[in-house]
């Protein structure tokens, strides 16, 4: 039997595929903009026949119909990175958050630490050789498919066929659900003056020929805009966005000087506009790989002049970075921040950067704080932080004492909060005992 016959034998409608899920199964579900939406709704429709199905996933772009309150008891969520679709469920205790570095998620599956019976993933249609591309999200999906007993492929004719280490052979698939639905789009934001200032300062740390890790949002967009005069930049990142596409088209990103995968944009997922999804379709410039490769710090470090640009919710005056919670309330997750911070630190000429606005809540709350809020999780330790960038400047923390760090971070805090930060450091005796606020460092 050739692959086409096997593929056709496994075609079924979405309701039949949903019946392959049993009570008490652990089910991996692909996430981000690749969430297999028809299966989510089909599972919701048969919720009354299911009990305690564990759904294991990262964030979903758009709604999660299985996170509704009336789904409790039928489905329970284990979330590896929290997004808006599941944040309320996590904060209310209806879903569980699992802290993990992005590079380690595939190993959770392969090692058997989290056995998976069913994997549900979105793919592009098969190519002429019978391989299904995972399209806009490779991340942990390939590992889940490798270990699952049942693999359900939601084959979306509107999914781009991406290249790299992101293919599933048709014979590995238990069920094929053919469909056509638009991927969620996240168009680029318009950076504010604050974000533009941050972007310009970050860009000053980027040399020609550097390799970048960029995310999505106003800060990375502002960084890319500020890099217009740079030459031969490369990309090794978690995520590809519209701004990466724009920088390729403008000639800023060529990958010509990359020391690992020269000429290639290496990533594990893509998120942006339909124009981006069309751009990466069958484009050999892009190489999509699983997160245990893209986010492996030792792989990242093989890129010389690696510049990692990550954000934070708050940074304390010693350099501890909180990026997953607002106090005790989980907001997002570890993601790949520390993967890239450490990878860039090990890279020859690497530059690990934490970039954030100096304030939140319309300027009423400082994001450079004396201490992280009670319950806040530290994602990047103070021993790992090299640069903290705000619209007020660049704090260089590498090789600095706590006393010196206070000075560096005060200088990039909003002026309205510097005196309070100084007083707190003095009261905690981080600044010298002979020092009193307003005198300067003794």
Regions found by a protein language model. Name each.
Residues 1-442:
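Conserved alpha/beta enzyme-core scaffold
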């Amino acid at each position: 039997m050739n692959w086409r016959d096997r593929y056709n034998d496994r075609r079924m409608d979405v309701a039949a595929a949903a019946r392959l899920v049993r009570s008490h199964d652990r089910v991996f579900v692909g996430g981000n903009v690749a969430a297999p939406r028809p299966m989510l709704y089909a599972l919701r429709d048969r919720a009354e026949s299911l009990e305690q199905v564990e759904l294991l996933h990262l964030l979903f772009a758009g709604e999660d119909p299985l996170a509704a309150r009336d789904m409790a008891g039928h489905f329970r969520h284990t979330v590896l990175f929290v997004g808006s679709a599941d944040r309320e469920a996590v904060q209310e205790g209806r879903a569980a958050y699992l802290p993990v570095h992005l590079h380690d998620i595939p190993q959770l599956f392969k090692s058997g630490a989290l056995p998976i019976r069913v994997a549900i993933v979105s793919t592009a249609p098969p190519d002429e050789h019978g391989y299904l591309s995972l399209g806009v999200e490779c991340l942990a999906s390939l590992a889940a498919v490798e270990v699952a007993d049942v693999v359900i492929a939601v084959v979306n004719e509107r999914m781009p066929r991406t290249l790299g280490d992101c293919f599933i052979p048709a014979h590995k698939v238990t069920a094929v659900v053919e469909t056509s639905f638009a991927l969620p789009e996240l168009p680029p934001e318009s950076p504010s003056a604050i974000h533009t200032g941050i972007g310009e300062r970050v860009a000053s740390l980027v040399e020609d020929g550097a390799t970048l890790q960029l995310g999505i949002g106003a800060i990375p967009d502002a960084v890319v805009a500020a890099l217009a005069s740079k030459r031969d930049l490369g990309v090794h990142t978690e995520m590809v966005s519209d701004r990466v596409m724009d920088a390729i088209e403008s000639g800023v990103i060529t990958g010509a000087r990359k020391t690992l995968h020269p000429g290639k944009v290496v990533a594990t997922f893509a998120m942006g506009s339909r124009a981006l999804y069309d751009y990466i379709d069958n484009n050999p410039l892009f190489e999509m790989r699983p997160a245990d490769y893209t986010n492996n710090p030792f792989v990242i470090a093989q890129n010389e002049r690696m510049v990692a640009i990550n954000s934070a919710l708050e940074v304390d005056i010693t350099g501890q970075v909180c990026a997953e919670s607002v106090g005790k309330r989980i907001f997002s997750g570890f993601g790949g921040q520390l993967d890239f911070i450490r990878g860039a630190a090990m890279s020859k000429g690497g530059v690990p950067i934490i970039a954030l606005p100096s304030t939140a809540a319309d300027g009423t709350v400082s994001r450079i704080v004396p201490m992280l809020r009670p319950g806040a999780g530290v994602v990047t330790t103070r021993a790992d932080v090299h640069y903290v960038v705000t619209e007020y400047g660049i704090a260089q923390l590498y090789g600095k004492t706590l006393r010196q760090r206070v000075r560096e971070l005060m200088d990039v805090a909003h002026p309205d909060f510097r005196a309070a930060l100084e007083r707190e450091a003095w009261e905690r005796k981080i600044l010298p005992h002979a020092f009193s606020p307003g005198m300067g460092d003794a």
